[in-house]
Amino acid sequence: MTNENLAVEKKNIINLFNQKKFGKISKISPKIRNLFEDQPDIIKIIVMSDLNTKNFIKAEQLLKKAVIINNTAEFNYILGNTLKIQDKNSEAIVSYKKSISIKKDFSEAYNNLANVQKKIGNFDEALLNYKNAIKTKEDNLEAYYNLANLYKSLKNYVEAKKNYKKVIEINPNFSDAYNNIGTIYSILGKFNDAKEFYIKSMNVNRYFAEPYKNYVQLCKIDEKDQVFKNLKEIIQKENLDEEQKEVFFYSISKAYFDIGNNDLAFKYLNSANKLKLEKLDYSFSKDKKEFKKIKEFFLNKKLIN
């Protein structure tokens, strides 16, 4: 391909990317892809398009070539993310470590390395690398939140609470952190403190369902309870996220049982169960389709052999 044709192809790729036509970019032939191996900006565009269209294998193949030519921290980090998505955990760890060896203060790489280490049960290493992520970037909210979650799962509630509070210090509107502090207080039997933090979580994000569920499980609800009044308003809202709606329905069902209105309690309990079954049916349908694809793949392999 002439330099002029290559320039035209490059311009076309950039235009498609600006138009968010990721599918068209992802379908670019291997021959064309290889022409841009030494052009990091175009490689990133093609890889991002592959990831947007869930063509993870294509992205992985291109990145593995790219790191040979441009062994940068960024390319190794993106390769690590691509491998992580595919549950190729050992390879992802290698890529994140390469990224960090090139750029010692790469906070995001430390954080994602820790995420993979946590996933495979290497908790001590995960704790260390979440702390490294924070050390290299003091306002890394995600690393603080992940560190808090890991401490919580390890039942180190003092450290978990401390790190959730750091999350809130960085972002006072982080409703999950308030809710999780509430859960810790509930586990420790400090129910008034738990209630306070569940309410704070609701105040920060009115449509985050989890603190409502936790609150109604903790308290006996009466009709004067402001949380109950809020629940009645929220469930009338259109376009609620289906998963959130399911939790809201369970929450108000429990509230109506407390109040003694069993008809409405069962009505919302049935609605919640229906949403749950629909979600399970959808997951089962997806699993069946995936199994069919795998089955066809192996049948085709037999035919080829």
Model-derived features: positions:
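Alpha-helical segment of the N-proximal tetratricopeptide repeat
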Residues: 7-28, 35, 45-48, 52
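Structural marker of alpha-solenoid helical repeat scaffolds
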Residues: 35, 68-69, 102, 136, ...
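Conserved alpha-helical positions within TPR/SEL1-like repeat arrays
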Residues: 44, 48, 77-85, 108-119, ...
